[in-house]
Amino acid sequence: MSRTKQTASKALGGKAPRKGISAKSIPSSGCSPAMPKRTRFKAGALALKEIRKYQKSTDLLIRKRPFQRMVRDLCKGREGVRFQASAIVAFQEAVENFLTSLMEDAYRCVLHAKRVTLMPKDICLVYKIKYANILYAALD
């Protein structure tokens, strides 16, 4: 191979060009290796599939162990507080029911504002409208 001179040029950045596949590297057997082709979904299709899955199920959405740890951590300062396993499961169901209804109402606020994205201000609005009497009763 003969050497050639190259002049210095300014690098423009970006990706390097892809190298083509040479004819020697392709197997001559004619069959291509069986690789499963991944299916591409439309944008948002997987999210809708996941929503339908969770709407059909009656399982708890928050994992039990992390929730149990959080409850025990919140009650750590109190002496002699103990929990039965069934009490923690009942508390978890109540919390998930509360959060689900809060998110449903917040999404109604999103639709009312003619938006698609749920924002923190929607959750704050629902909390102020729905639970204002509880909040102010606790302050008195």
Swiss-Prot record:
Query: Where does the protein end up?
Result: Nucleus; Chromosome
Keywords in alphabetical order: Acetylation, Chromosome, DNA-binding, Methylation, Nucleosome core, Nucleus
Q: Annotated Gene Ontology MF terms?
A: DNA binding; protein heterodimerization activity; structural constituent of chromatin
Q: Which segments carry the region annotation Disordered?
A: 1-36
Residue ranges the record marks as coiled coil: none
Residues bearing PTM N6-methyllysine? 5, 10, 19, 24
Q: Which residues are recorded with the post-translational modification N6,N6-dimethyllysine?
A: 5, 15
CDD domains found in the cross-reference section: HFD_H3
- Keyword DNA-binding attached: yes
The modified positions for N6-acetyllysine read 10, 15, 19, 24, 56, 64
Q: List the InterPro entries.
A: Histone-fold (IPR009072), Histone_H2A/H2B/H3 (IPR007125), Histone_H3/CENP-A (IPR000164)
A GO cellular-component term linked to this record: nucleosome
Family matches, as Pfam families: Histone
Q: What is its main location?
A: nucleus
Q: What function does this protein fulfil? A: Core component of nucleosome. Nucleosomes wrap and compact DNA into chromatin, limiting DNA accessibility to the cellular machineries which require DNA as a template. Histones thereby play a central role in transcription regulation, DNA repair, DNA replication and chromosomal stability. DNA accessibility is regulated via a complex set of post-translational modifications of histones, also called histone code, and nucleosome remodeling.
Q: Which family does it belong to?
A: Belongs to the histone H3 family.
- This chain's protein is named Histone H3-like protein
Taxonomic placement: Eukaryota, Fungi, Fungi incertae sedis, Microsporidia, Unikaryonidae
